[in-house]
Amino acid sequence: AQSLSFSFTKFDPNQEDLIFQGTATSKLDSAGNPVSSSAGRVLYSAPLRLWEDSAVLTSFDPTIYIFTNYTSRIADGLAFIAPPDSVISYHGGFLGLFPNAAESGIAESNVVAVEFDTDYLNPDYGDPNYIHIGIDVNSIRSKVTASWDWQNGKIATAHISYNSVSKRLSVTTYYPGRGKPATSYDIELHTVLPEWVRVGLSASTGQNIERNTVHSWSFTSSLWTNVAKVGVASISG
């Protein structure tokens, strides 16, 4: 059996277990504000094994505590990601995950992400007309979404899970004393992602800015092989 487990309550660029990319190291202007048209990621340094022998039976439960704050107009949000590489992409509504279709002709990339989208005014991205959570597979156009009762300046709990038997990726996020919006999508991860990936968080700004602060992030996983030599990974984070 193989396993991956970590828990962070602070994020320091000097931490050996974390990879900071782009503006993830709190890039601020002279007034102490985040910078517009920028993107940043934090990845866990050790790669995660998702599957073995072309069989994916993965279960995971990431838990993240997120604080989002804006002072003028909301920006683009934050995403939990499982990318096949460490290359940061376009800012703005692309969340540092996907190329700009206007420049490259495509808005796709091999990645699975759960987005916490605070800027819903992006009809070109297929966004619904409300702040939402969504599951993205290879495209910024979410496969499924759910309305998010987002509270500016308050800490939200986000819980993500992938069930290895049902092949269901689920997400719920909530504030104390409020409802728990949730959505899910059925996917076989080995059809989208390579055997080894890194997990992390990605955020970006466009013309508008907001500060996304992660107060804590926990993650555990394990990989088994049964008698039929089928790879099974369990992930919590």
From Swiss-Prot:
PROSITE patterns: LECTIN_LEGUME_ALPHA, LECTIN_LEGUME_BETA. Mn(2+) binds at residues 115, 117, 127, 132. InterPro entries: ConA-like_dom_sf, L-lectin, Lectin_LegA_CS, Lectin_legB_Mn/Ca_BS, Legume_lectin_dom, Leguminous_Lectin. It comes from the Eukaryota. The modification Blocked amino end (Ile) is found at residue 106. Glycans are attached at residue 69. GO terms for molecular function: D-mannose binding; metal ion binding. The N-terminus of alpha chain is blocked. The alpha and beta chains are produced by proteolytic processing, with probably the loss of intervening amino acid(s). Ca(2+) binds at residues 117, 120, 122, 127. CDD domains: lectin_legume_LecRK_Arcelin_ConA (cd06899). The keyword Metal-binding applies. Keywords: Calcium, Glycoprotein, Lectin, Manganese, Mannose-binding, Metal-binding. It holds the Pfam family Lectin_legB. Belongs to the leguminous lectin family. D-mannose/D-glucose-binding lectin. Requires Ca(2+) and Mn(2+) ions for full activity. PANTHER family: CONCANAVALIN A-LIKE LECTIN FAMILY PROTEIN, LEGUME LECTIN DOMAIN-CONTAINING PROTEIN. Tetramer of two alpha and two beta chains. This is Lectin. It comes from Lablab purpureus.
